[in-house]
Amino acid sequence: MSKFARIIGTGSYLPPTVITNDDLSKTINTTNEWIVARTGIKQRHKVTNETTCDLAEKAANRALEMAGINVKDLDLIILATTTADKIFPATATILQTAIGASCPAFDLQSVCAGFIFALTTAEQYIKASAANKVLVVGSETLSRIVNWNDRSTAVLFGDGAGAVVLSGSDNTGILYSKLFSDGNYLSSLQVSNNYINEVGFIEMSGNEVFKIAVNRLSSLAEKTLKETNLNSNKLDWIVPHQANIRIISAVAKRIKTPMNKVIVTLENHGNTSAASIPLALDTAVRDGRIKRGDHLLFEGIGAGFSWGSILIQF
């Protein structure tokens, strides 16, 4: 039985079509300056013909390549997504076939907290000796459910995918995880229509989401550090859900962590929901900021609301 679940490979993928803030200003009442000041986002990526599985496949293959394992060594695949390619089967099973795996595969839907929930689930499989190698992917094509005429949401969301490969370890890995949900705030952030029968778009009460996100994530970050006896100055990096620079900055300030210890990539891809944490992680691993042995705090909140944190020694 492994004591820890350790990340041994990361990967990410963004579709080639880029929508800049200036592009958006041609169709809705906004400006680059307005968007950057309120969100920190400069551009987002948008699929043309690619599916959620297509993005996931590319990110997964890059993570598997870094991990240096054969796809047949995978014991489980968990795909976190809000934008599944079909009502059924699970997009994870389509991904399984696409990459040539033969293990069980399932989807997990917890919106922007999806990767946190999926990674925690994978950790439990490994610690219970039900799996040793697990592929966890966050992949989204949110452009399919964005109303591009709604300034409050069109400026925020983008498409992309990120992936990690987890392996059992006796030495280091995930040290702590905590998950929460509270369904009392359903109307604050949702796709209102029944998408099985109707076309629905993301609807959001921005001010309420901001307040709840900052409060919940700050409290959870403080709780995580306290329960693991880790001072914030011993934390090497925060890798947050890339939702909004104001939320990210407010949480960092509450736990007395300077922004130069926070991985921020949302300016290049916007809010990619379940893909955002693994996207940011892969970027920082590949550019050398995150190194083996670093203590990382993942934290994110999504509609529902559902939120969670993971402390990991990379």
Curated annotation (Swiss-Prot):
Keywords: Acyltransferase, Cytoplasm, Fatty acid biosynthesis, Fatty acid metabolism, Lipid biosynthesis, Lipid metabolism, Multifunctional enzyme, Transferase. The active site is at C112, H241, N271. The keyword Transport does not apply. It catalyses: malonyl-[ACP] + acetyl-CoA + H(+) = 3-oxobutanoyl-[ACP] + CO2 + CoA. GO terms for molecular function: 3-oxoacyl-[acyl-carrier-protein] synthase activity; beta-ketoacyl-acyl-carrier-protein synthase III activity. Residues 242-246 are annotated as: ACP-binding. It comes from the Bacteria. It is found in: Cytoplasm. CDD domains: KAS_III. Belongs to the thiolase-like superfamily. FabH family. The last Arg residue of the ACP-binding site is essential for the weak association between ACP/AcpP and FabH. This is Beta-ketoacyl-[acyl-carrier-protein] synthase III. The lineage of its organism: Bacteria, Pseudomonadati, Pseudomonadota, Gammaproteobacteria, Candidatus Pseudothioglobaceae.
